[in-house]
């Protein structure tokens, strides 16, 4: 009997016995899966570089989108759990196939780019863990290919053969580790009272002026960084997929209230806290330190020049000293891993639902497992073709995410007010938040498009 117990005990069960880890076990669920997936390379890049480049000026964006995310995702959860239908099936049958394809096609293309950016972050993180940068130009060769293949195989194997519940638990554990790293640095930065004054100023909505990248002819755009933060917070694929996740996790109508509070815990508190502390860490440990007259690392002496993972890893310097770049690089591997899996899971739901196939993640659903693996493997293996620093790739992917966000929010607003939801239809307060979210996203998209032609 003792032997049997030892054999069947899962790694998650062992972790749950460690101090503090068990306290967070109750957070596991689709909200934790989504939160962990949203604390990926895109989240780190958009917020850390916002803090590094613009100080606290963009803190308001990261903070104000939190309630938008919570209410939008909880509304999507209601729709999925009560109807038991996939979002794309509902769009096809209740509105029209034309709209389903209008959303699906660009979502597919954007998420190929997102997954490429996540694998690039993992590869650059792997090199950064050894204190180097990936080879570029003519130096790119077999070594880069081997690292990419190994990381791709490890990610696909862990995701596909672990099962849905195991994926949830892996995501939750990684979520907590990544969050803890940044909290330490942010707390140290907040010990200076002047930091609080600057932080307060960052709560006032503003678009900081563009800054010139020292030593080059390039600039960093404050508005583009706003688009990137909002695009990472309101990705249409995550918003539309949340109902699938809630249904797949076994939620029932009676679980909706408890599920709402889990969403508040995971997205409102943990992910929201992450968003704030990463900007605080970037502002205090990078923006205030790399001023051009201070330290130099990999040839970078000014905050405007920061764009590679090892240099950005200096953000953990106040807590970890010389180990900071290596530890940060390992964290980026974990962050890229979570989002790569989360996005692949989301797109597998969408593809199977569009094809009218079973979209539930079970060990018996072989088409799901095959497509899930392909969504990890194909973008990951072609990632080296795109030659940009990984953090800049992530920012570009997040900006692309925002384009369909207004449509996704409006669809959720439509379905959460349908008579089929009965007593769980949205009330005035929820509709107000969803309406503000749609207008906020639409305003950013319109201004972004206008900026391209003016």
For each feature predicted by the language model, list its residue ranges.
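Juxtamembrane transmembrane-helix boundary signature
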Residues: 34, 61-92, 103-117
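Extracellular loop-to-transmembrane helix junctions
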Residues: 49-74, 97-99, 401
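Hydrophobic alpha-helical segments and their helix-loop junctions in multi-pass secondary transporters
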Residues: 176-214, 226, 232-243, 409-420, ...
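Selective recognition of specific alpha-helical transmembrane segments in multi-pass small-molecule
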Residues: 60-75, 184, 234, 260-288
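Hydrophobic, small-residue-rich membrane helices and short re-entrant helix-turn-helix hairpins
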Residues: 45-51, 166-169, 215, 237-273, ...
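Hydrophobic transmembrane alpha-helices that form the core helical bundles
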Residues: 100-135, 336-355, 389-390, 442
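Transmembrane alpha-helical segments of multi-pass small-molecule transport proteins
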Residues: 104, 131-160, 176-182, 363-381, ...
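Flexible loop linkers connecting adjacent transmembrane helices
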Residues: 6-14, 46-51, 74-99, 124-134, ...
């Amino acid at each position: 009997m003792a032997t049997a117990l030892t054999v069947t005990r899962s790694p998650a069960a062992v972790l749950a016995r460690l101090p503090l880890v068990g306290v967070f076990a109750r957070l596991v669920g689709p909200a934790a899966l989504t939160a962990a997936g949203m604390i990926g390379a895109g989240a780190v890049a958009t917020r850390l570089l916002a803090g590094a480049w613009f100080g606290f000026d963009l803190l308001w964006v990261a903070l104000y989108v939190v309630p938008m995310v919570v209410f939008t995702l909880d509304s999507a959860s209601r729709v999925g759990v009560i109807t038991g239908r996939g979002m794309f099936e509902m769009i096809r049958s209740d509105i029209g196939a034309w709209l389903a394809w209008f959303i699906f096609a660009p979502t597919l293309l954007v998420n190929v780019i997102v997954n490429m950016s996540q694998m690039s972050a993992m590869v650059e993180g792997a090199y950064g863990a050894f204190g180097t940068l990936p080879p570029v130009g003519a130096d790119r060769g077999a070594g880069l290919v081997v690292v990419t293949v190994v990381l791709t195989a490890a990610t696909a194997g862990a995701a596909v053969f672990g099962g849905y519940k195991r994926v949830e638990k892996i995501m939750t554990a990684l979520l907590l580790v990544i969050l803890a790293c940044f909290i330490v640095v942010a707390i140290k930065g907040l010990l200076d009272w002047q930091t609080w004054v600057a932080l307060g100023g960052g709560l006032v909505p503003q678009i900081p002026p563009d800054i010139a990248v020292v030593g080059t002819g390039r600039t960093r755009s404050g508005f583009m960084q706003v688009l990137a933060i909002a695009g990472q917070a309101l990705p249409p694929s995550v918003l539309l997929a949340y109902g699938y996740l809630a249904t797949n996790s076994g939620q029932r109508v009676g679980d909706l209230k408890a599920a709402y509070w889990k969403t508040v815990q995971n997205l409102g508190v943990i992910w929201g806290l992450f968003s704030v502390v990463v900007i605080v860490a970037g502002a205090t440990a990078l923006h205030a330190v790399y001023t051009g007259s201070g330290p130099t690392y990999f040839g970078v002496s000014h905050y405007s020049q920061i764009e590679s993972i090892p240099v950005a890893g200096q953000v953990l310097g106040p807590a970890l000293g010389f180990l900071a770049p290596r530890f940060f690089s390992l964290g980026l591997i974990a962050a890229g891993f979570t989002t790569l899996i989360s996005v692949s899971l989301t797109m597998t739901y969408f593809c199977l639902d569009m094809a009218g196939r079973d979209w539930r993640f079970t060990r018996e659903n072989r088409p799901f497992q095959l497509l899930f693996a392909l969504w990890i493997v194909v973008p990951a293996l072609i990632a080296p073709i795109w030659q940009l620093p990984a953090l800049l790739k992530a920012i570009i992917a997040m900006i692309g995410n925002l384009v369909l966000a207004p449509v996704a929010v409006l669809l959720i607003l439509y379905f959460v007010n349908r008579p089929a939801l009965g007593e769980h239809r949205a009330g005035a307060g929820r509709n107000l938040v969803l309406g503000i979210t749609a207008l906020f996203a639409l305003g950013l998209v319109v201004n972004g498009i206008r900026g391209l032609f003016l």
